[in-house]
């Protein structure tokens, strides 16, 4: 039995908006627009600058940032407006997503279209959404102090919260849409499939570290790095003493290594599980791998990089869908009516 149609559509819209938010966030980062707004004003920040005086005030605030001093000291007002608007759209869309998600919850709860367990789950998502907004500002603040870019660790944390939010929303949507656990498989195969999906999440976080360090702008060949599969600089004692995840070479190598590992581990899944979901997941993994290589050799072309980022979420969605269709031996079938009373 499916959940109320309106609930299913609403969750589908929220999932779609989250993916669009990922695209906007990627474009914001790739165009170096994220540090153009130097204040966090959740309410009054909805209104953009109006008039030349207001724009000049915003540009003056931007002039106090490390990014302006190191990278954009000669930026014109028109160019500043362009990057400001990109970040403004990013923040405004985040507010819109929060409103679209939060406002219908009381109505669905009062009209009994969702049960108490679902209400609790959705309120947890709303709380995570608030944390995500705060994490976004925490990330931006790291680029307003000394260095002209945000902390790659905070960027990874920001992305991980998005992954968590999207996964919960997508799983809820699938269950409300009536997706059932209909294919029985062994515990070993189920947990192998789950581990590959977990590796996908790890790879997405590593991708955020690569992006935060601008590591994609180096070693723009594949499969070799500096003429070798394993670059010699990885064996430097200085690297290990200075911090492995601070090093551009190390982080990019890890991202490459996990990508290959995911492809190798995902390849046998369709033959083990014998489901269309496993084939879809493998296809997404393969396409995402090719997008990653294309992004690298193009020296991070904006379109390819944005598609690579959002397709990571598409691959994750395919993985979650694959797992939702599986039932371990000895377990009971999980029905698809988790959203109704």
From Swiss-Prot:
GO molecular function, one term: metal ion binding
GO cellular component: plasma membrane
Names of required cofactors: heme b
Matching InterPro entries: COX15/CtaA_fam, HemeA_Synthase_type2
Membrane topology category: Multi-pass membrane protein
Broad class of the protein's primary localization: membrane
Pathway: Porphyrin-containing compound metabolism; heme A biosynthesis; heme A from heme O: step 1/1
Entry keyword set: Cell membrane, Heme biosynthesis, Iron, Membrane, Metal-binding, Oxidoreductase, Transmembrane, Transmembrane helix
Enzyme class of the recorded protein, top EC level: oxidoreductase
Reaction(s) the record says it catalyses: Fe(II)-heme o + 2 A + H2O = Fe(II)-heme a + 2 AH2
Function according to Swiss-Prot or TrEMBL: Catalyzes the conversion of heme O to heme A by two successive hydroxylations of the methyl group at C8. The first hydroxylation forms heme I, the second hydroxylation results in an unstable dihydroxymethyl group, which spontaneously dehydrates, resulting in the formyl group of heme A.
Entry-linked PANTHER family: CYTOCHROME C OXIDASE ASSEMBLY PROTEIN COX15, CYTOCHROME C OXIDASE ASSEMBLY PROTEIN COX15 HOMOLOG
UniProt xrefs under HAMAP family: HemeA_synth_type2 (MF_01665)
Protein name in the entry: Heme A synthase
